[in-house]
């Protein structure tokens, strides 16, 4: 099984890391990316670890940061459709596939 991150979700990941680097420090930005990578490995190892959220999609909360990974398992891949801040624009990613 492989992890596929849609372009919009990758942009969100990069934007969040850039925000942490600009407003705090590079170490915090690197910690954010490392936390995302840890979560991605967890999701790949056990795709059903997160609760269902909005139909077939699932939401995995990052431990240290106020972000969630919105994904859904497909036949041979896990598709990440959003790296969503938990307090901003809920559900904006609904149309993504």
Task: Please annotate each region the language model reported.
Residues 29, 51-53, 92:
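Short, hydrophobic secondary-structure boundary micro-motifs
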Residues 24, 47, 54, 84, ...:
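Short, flexible helix/strand-to-coil boundary loops that buttress conserved ligand/catalytic motifs
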Residues 48-78:
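Basic/aromatic recognition patch in beta-strand/loop cores that engages polyanionic ligands
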Residues 1-33:
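Arg/Lys-rich, positively charged N-terminal/basic patches that mediate binding to nucleic acids
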Residues 32, 39, 56-58:
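A generic structural signal for short beta-strands and their flanking turns/coil linkers
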Residues 40-44:
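Short proline/glycine- and basic residue-enriched helix-capping loop/turn segments at helix->loop/beta transitions
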Residues 2-15, 38, 77, 93-97:
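Small, basic N-terminal interaction modules of short regulatory proteins
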Residues 68, 72-97:
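Enriched for short, Lys/Arg-rich terminal
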């Amino acid at each position: 099984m492989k992890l596929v991150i849609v372009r919009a979700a990758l942009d969100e990941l990069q934007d969040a890391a850039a925000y942490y680097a600009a407003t705090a420090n590079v170490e915090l930005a690197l910690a954010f990316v490392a936390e995302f990578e840890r979560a991605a490995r967890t999701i790949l190892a056990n795709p059903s670890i997160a609760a269902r959220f909005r139909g077939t999609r699932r939401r995995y909360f990052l431990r240290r940061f106020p972000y969630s990974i919105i994904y859904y398992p497909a036949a041979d891949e896990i598709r990440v459709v959003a790296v969503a801040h938990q307090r901003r624009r809920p559900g904006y990613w609904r149309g993504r596939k």
